[in-house]
């Protein structure tokens, strides 16, 4: 059984507008049989934090193209993307690079 994981989840670049304008969220993910990874975190975010228009944040089980994901200030592509196993006190930042004109 994986222990609960405490994280700071942040949204920027306009992505925070989908989360009632709140940029920083301190979250504790409950214990579950498998370790928490980014894939499961995204499902949790969709169910618990996302307030409107999920299609602007997610596509399938991942984030939409144009949303940069940083884990502890490193690009998630260097960390294993959806398969990265979350550690207690990780900081996960989602930044939208999509802007209207």
Curated annotation (Swiss-Prot):
Keyword Acyltransferase part of the UniProt annotation: no
Gene Ontology biological process: protein urmylation; tRNA thio-modification; tRNA wobble uridine modification
Domain of life: Eukaryota
MF terms (GO), sorted A to Z: protein tag activity
Primary location recorded for the protein, binned into one broad class: cytoplasm
Protein localization: Cytoplasm
Cross-link position per record: Glycyl lysine isopeptide (Gly-Lys) (interchain with K-? in acceptor proteins): 101
Protein name: Ubiquitin-related modifier 1
Annotated source species: Gallus gallus
Lineage: Eukaryota, Metazoa, Chordata, Craniata, Vertebrata
């Amino acid at each position: 059984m994986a222990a609960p994981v405490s994280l700071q989840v942040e949204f920027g670049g306009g992505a925070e507008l989908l989360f009632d304008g709140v940029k920083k969220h301190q979250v504790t993910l409950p214990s579950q049989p498998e370790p928490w990874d980014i894939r499961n975190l995204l499902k949790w975010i969709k169910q618990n934090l996302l307030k409107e228009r999920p299609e602007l944040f997610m596509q399938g089980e991942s984030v939409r193209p144009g949303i940069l994901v940083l884990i502890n200030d490193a690009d998630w592509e260097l960390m294993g993307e959806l398969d990265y196993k979350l550690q207690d006190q990780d900081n996960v930042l989602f930044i939208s690079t999509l802007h209207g004109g």
